[in-house]
Amino acid sequence: MITGELKNKVDKIWEIFWTGGITNPLEVIEQFNYLLFIKQLDEVETRKERDANILGIPYEGIFPADCQQYRWSKFKNLGDANEIYDLMMNGVFPFIKNLHPDGESAYSKYMGDAIFKIPTPALLTKVIDGIDGLNLQGDSKGDLYEYLLSKLESAGKNGQFRTPRHIIQMMVELVKPVPSDIICDPAMGSAGFLICLLYTSD
């Protein structure tokens, strides 16, 4: 079960995303997971490097010599938000997307369409600081994911899912409403469907 401390930290990161402009719960979880993966990738690399050093055996790391700057422990301390953002957009994110470029592995298939959506350097650095403060050991990782999924479930119940505009437009075009139709949207949130219908009728 998730501890109160971890829950509070996750809630704070969620709020940072929300106030920073990412309000779709699915996108919050997606971007949260990408950054968490980047952090854990560096932690695994550090552990394997240490073990190889103790055992005196060679280790060919995940991060080549010319990609060391893509490690969480390196870029989180750059200090300049714009520099971190540029490195993430043009270096770190493309790097993790292409870790398995064969196109056959499950990783390649799931990461092939991954998009970095954090809109500003300020938001990215706040989220990095928040995630860096998460001390995830053992079962706490599973607890974290369960909690994120529970937030996704409650967001759906609270009507926090927004239907993308192009989907709304397609559905309205398929229905082909006429002025004499009576229209009801019982799951109305921001009234996207009704507004689109109004524009269509005009």
Q: Predicted segments — roles?
A:
Residues S180-A187:
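Conserved class I S-adenosyl-L-methionine
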Residues Y199-D202:
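Conserved small/polar residues in nucleotide/adenosyl-binding loops
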Residues K157, A187-S190:
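Short glycine/serine/threonine-biased micro-segments
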Residues M1-P179:
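Non-catalytic, mostly N-terminal accessory regions of nucleic-acid modification and defense proteins
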Residues A191, I195:
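Glycine-rich SAM-binding Motif I of class I
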